[in-house]
Amino acid sequence: AHMATEAIWGYGYGAQPGISVFSYNRISSGDFRKKSFVGADRSFDAIAPYTTLTEEEFATIAPYASFKFHAANGEKRNYSTGNVTSIPMMRVEEMYLIEAEATAHYDATTGKSLLQSFMANRDPAYTVPAANDLIDEIIFQKRIEFWGEGVIFYDLKRLNIGMHNGDTGTNAPPMAQLSTDGRAPWWNCVFPLNAVQQNKALAGKNNPNPTQTVKSVK
């Protein structure tokens, strides 16, 4: 329910998880995955074929809100029906993108070809941008493909990719308007205080040092 914008029940009601405006704007207009998100103009006509919400209900939806996840059988009011859904633990698309990235690290030409082949089923007019770093482009397409599925987190850590929620023009809420050079310090789980207090051998060995701070970008 927390990921389904249409769900009108429980704690998830009104949550409206959304995509970064920077990511949304980077998705090509011919990519069908862009239809998973509400545009800046909040056009109901654009999203109507893909939702069970009425135009009146849609009026409360914010720009860039996600419609990628839906309540089961389109049931937006009854949680006992709408919440019953399968959760894929692994998708074959991930394997294609892992192959493309791994190949690109040592053979850019073949890696580019693999990405091009993958994207042909998402945007037939897509071409790998010449100006973009190939690894960055592959990871971006992976971010869009698995948006909201929790897959990309470890890629961001592994490749030391930073956050840009504090950049000019952000649509992130005020408390989340933070930008980092490289991985964010809070992405590592630290030992809880109770564990450190009970086990003196952990003193000074937290992972990472939780005193690092990130300032909000105004």
Where would I find each of the regions flagged by the language model?
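Acidic/polar-rich alpha-helix caps and helix-coil junctions
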Residues: 1-218
